[in-house]
């Protein structure tokens, strides 16, 4: 399971600055889910082969009534979700009563916590450690979050208990948290035991629980239910038509066969982890509410992760034709960025259209993991360039030479050529659409990566042999004599 780190502390101690620095290699997945997470911000970061989820919380002022109320509700939830808590204090402001109360609460929670003394610019680190020793939480780790100093030591300590990602290596530039770009995550195909992993995600009360129970209907073959911790999703292996699947349910534990929908506790951490572990994501929306901003934020999670996607509009039954037409228009207008995904109009309660989801899951997964030979991908590239050549840059044509497969789920196509760093975004979209059309990809995003061709002889002088030098001398002498004769005739 991906470790979760929460940043807590008083207002203006530098939590957001540290959050932005740590997530710079992969920008914050979502800024604020208003109404769902309020003051919590979630991002994904990576450090020396370890991927982790980072939570930035609102400040805790310490002037509320009673300790449980003094801790802001969202910060409390973040602490409960986290594996590790980084308790930020302001080294310039010094030790405060609010720091004392927050520290006491963390000690009571028996949560792995570290005191981070931020803003130690021009402050003796030993003095900062001594200043916050009364917290009784061990030596404070001094950092300067705005400048990146001390972050290496902080992350080494915070992540020391967690294993590295499978087959991952540290990324270049991580030591100073300044590397840019991102590495698309690759996941293996379905195991013989688990089958295709399907994550059911969506806002609270859109029908996720009902859909899960409908998909695990009378013809199900449940192998086992494996509940996790309070923040873990439920993994439910089952079979349908001799095909194996594993449902990743973020809605929580429920009684077998319970169909009615209850108010669900929404957890961004559950959603992020479910998406990360899934092969295919079924995104559930409430057709009667249409497309809302929270839907777009959650779809951004799946798109960022590159997972195969199927969209299910639930509660379609009972809607008037005019209402249905309006919803379809809204889908085309607001979900254009996921136009590759199949959309199903269903009623999880009555089962209408639910069975059709499986075919889309199969098709999406097949598109996401199919492998094509280099010759096939290169031919598609050549045809695309022949039909619509790349633009000129500084009077030189961008040259795209060949393509090969770089990864799966999502498909990553690596294109080699010259001046590839100058390929405009519009042409990248043209290539994406071409590959999607020719390869008949459905339900999966596609990513294109460019690699420039290096000239192995660049900077090298051509060294002539003795024979070439003599030949060059004779030719020069011949040209000089010919020029002299022409001048004499004039």
Swiss-Prot record:
GO terms for biological process: ribosome biogenesis. GTP 2 binds at residues 202-209, 249-253, 314-317. Keywords: GTP-binding, Nucleotide-binding, Repeat, Ribosome biogenesis. GO terms for molecular function: GTP binding; ribosome binding. It comes from the Bacteria. Residues 3-166, 196-369 form the EngA-type G domain. Residues 370-454 form the KH-like domain. GTP 1 binds at residues 9-16, 56-60, 118-121. InterPro entries: G_ENGA, GTP-bd, GTPase_Der, KH_dom-like, KH_dom-like_a/b, P-loop_NTPase, Small_GTP-bd. CDD domains: EngA1, EngA2. Residues 470-490 have a biased composition (Basic residues). Residues 182-191 have a biased composition (Basic and acidic residues). Residues 166-181 have a biased composition (Acidic residues). It holds the Pfam family KH_dom-like. Disulfide bonds: none annotated. SUPFAM superfamilies: P-loop containing nucleoside triphosphate hydrolases. Residues 164-191, 452-490 are annotated as: Disordered. GTPase that plays an essential role in the late steps of ribosome biogenesis. Belongs to the TRAFAC class TrmE-Era-EngA-EngB-Septin-like GTPase superfamily. EngA (Der) GTPase family. Associates with the 50S ribosomal subunit. NCBIfam families: GTPase_EngA, small_GTP. PANTHER family: GTPASE DER. This is GTPase Der.
